[in-house]
């Protein structure tokens, strides 16, 4: 009799009613997205629920593959599911569909650009001045996003001083197909630069409107295809090229790059003011050359002073997304076409770039959710 009872309990869950989809959703309503501050059920993240006896399987579809807390969310989901009476095993698969930038309509917005129809988010990486490792930051962020599973493109908008082709290794030069250009790929990332169409060792001598025309072609006549993020490496200044981009493409937001010292902040503030005037959200600040760790003493040395990025972020009410240390290997990798996040993923600078990429993706997701009405209000301040 005891044997029959045991068998019956194994088959029926000890007399408990079977686990239902409603039970699963009720349990997962306790799991909140840390950025959107809503539960993952009401946000529509929970998909493909499958219940087989005491095993529950499902997908949690996030708003970006670059979400740095996806493993934490997965663990929370599994823990909540195992609290349901009758659930012995929880199988949670984390997926992602990058949300599309849908800015609120304004008169200043450009018309829809067919060449960019498949691009979900366009992010400007800018500083207003040269020499702050802006291009290095753009390259490493692009690869950090790609490593997380995103489809990424990289546009070198510095017509007068293009450096991206030196910093990455693309498989072939850009090819012409009719009226459009097919960009080459550099280890999975689509890349375009004026240096691909000229002798890289010679100066590009163009008047401002002509330089703007080159960038307009890159935005309207390049087959970017389906991308989660198009990273635009901005040139120094606040002139024709910057205005052309804002008139041709709808930017999701801008990442501001600075070094710690005040002489950098003078020009960087002008770039921030430009984006505010153009009604482009500033997603945050990244500080490069923040410190150097000495091999001998293992201490941080603030060679270019300290706190500039933090002051800038506080001044404009945005987030300081990260501080990148000085590492000679970054410069070597840039010269040899080997991005630091690929060649030294465990290095402190690579981890910092990866963290910034994750924070940037989350900021874009928050902004997109707000524009779509998922959120009533939000703050771009990162804590």
Regions from the language model: what does each represent?
Residues 42-45, 50, 63, 70-126, ...:
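Extreme N-terminal, non-catalytic leader segments
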